[in-house]
């Protein structure tokens, strides 16, 4: 089972990715993790990527797709995989298809921008431990304080409204077109497309995923 997850930052992809990995026994392939691993291992692609990154440039689609192909050839991907953070653009999706990397399911988590801003803006983090709270969904026992240590909680820059709205603008411009791309792929019989309402409770979304994917 080869799965791609689509959805804006904060739409709940990470949470559902954990559920899918556990249920279907497939690894999550994150382009960030792959890049770090390839650089650490000193592979040809890793060295090439490091050179580009050291110059402060973006790693090309060719390098990323090379890494994806290497990664999915490994044993733990024989039953499938979950692609996270890739493809992000139509050229990447085209290049992936040309490289012979097919997809069985494309899952879109649909969440309005304002809901995402509320979700992410409500996050509070304990920097030392990485514990994450939410003022609405998972509040600390004492407002603004970590449950275990009593230390002050912070709002990460990434979770501030201005930053979130910038990231959402990039998503709508670059990645949202993939919704149409994979919908068309599904109509052509190349994959199945699933659009889920990501505003519902986590358990409900997981249950619907399990039902749809079988």
Swiss-Prot record:
Keywords: ATP-binding, Cytoplasm, Kinase, Nucleotide biosynthesis, Nucleotide-binding, Transferase. The keyword Membrane does not apply. Disulfide bonds: none annotated. Residues 122-159 are annotated as: LID. It comes from the Bacteria. It catalyses: AMP + ATP = 2 ADP. GO terms for molecular function: adenylate kinase activity; ATP binding. AMP binds at residues 31, 36, 57-59, 85-88, 92, 156, 167. One of its GO terms (biological process) is AMP salvage. One of its GO terms (cellular component) is cytoplasm. The keyword Cell membrane does not apply. ATP binds at residues 10-15, 123, 132-133, 200. HAMAP family: Adenylate_kinase_Adk. Consists of three domains, a large central CORE domain and two small peripheral domains, NMPbind and LID, which undergo movements during catalysis. The LID domain closes over the site of phosphoryl transfer upon ATP binding. Assembling and dissambling the active center during each catalytic cycle provides an effective means to prevent ATP hydrolysis. Catalyzes the reversible transfer of the terminal phosphate group between ATP and AMP. Plays an important role in cellular energy homeostasis and in adenine nucleotide metabolism. Belongs to the adenylate kinase family. This is Adenylate kinase. The lineage of its organism: Bacteria, Pseudomonadati, Pseudomonadota, Gammaproteobacteria, Alteromonadales.
């Amino acid at each position: 089972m080869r799965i791609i997850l689509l959805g804006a930052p904060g739409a709940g992809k990470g949470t559902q990715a954990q559920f899918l990995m556990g249920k279907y026994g497939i690894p999550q392939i994150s382009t960030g993790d792959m890049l770090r691993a390839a650089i650490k291992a000193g592979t040809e692609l890793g060295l090439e990527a490091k050179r580009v990154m050291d110059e402060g440039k973006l790693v090309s689609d060719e390098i990323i797709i090379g890494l994806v192909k290497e990664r999915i050839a490994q044993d733990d991907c024989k039953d499938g995989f979950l692609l996270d953070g890739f493809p992000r653009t139509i050229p990447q999706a085209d290049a992936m298809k040309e490289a012979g990397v097919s997809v069985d399911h494309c899952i879109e988590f649909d969440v309005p921008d304002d809901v995402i801003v509320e979700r992410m803006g409500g996050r509070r983090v304990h920097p030392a431990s990485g514990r994450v709270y939410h003022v609405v969904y998972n509040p600390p026992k004492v407002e603004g304080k970590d449950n275990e240590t009593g230390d002050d909680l912070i709002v990460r820059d990434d979770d501030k409204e201005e930053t979130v709205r910038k990231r959402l603008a990039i998503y709508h411009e670059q990645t949202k077109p993939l919704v149409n791309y994979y919908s068309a792929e599904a109509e052509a019989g190349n994959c199945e497309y699933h659009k889920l309402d990501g505003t519902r409770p986590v358990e409900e979304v997981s249950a619907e995923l399990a039902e749809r994917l079988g």
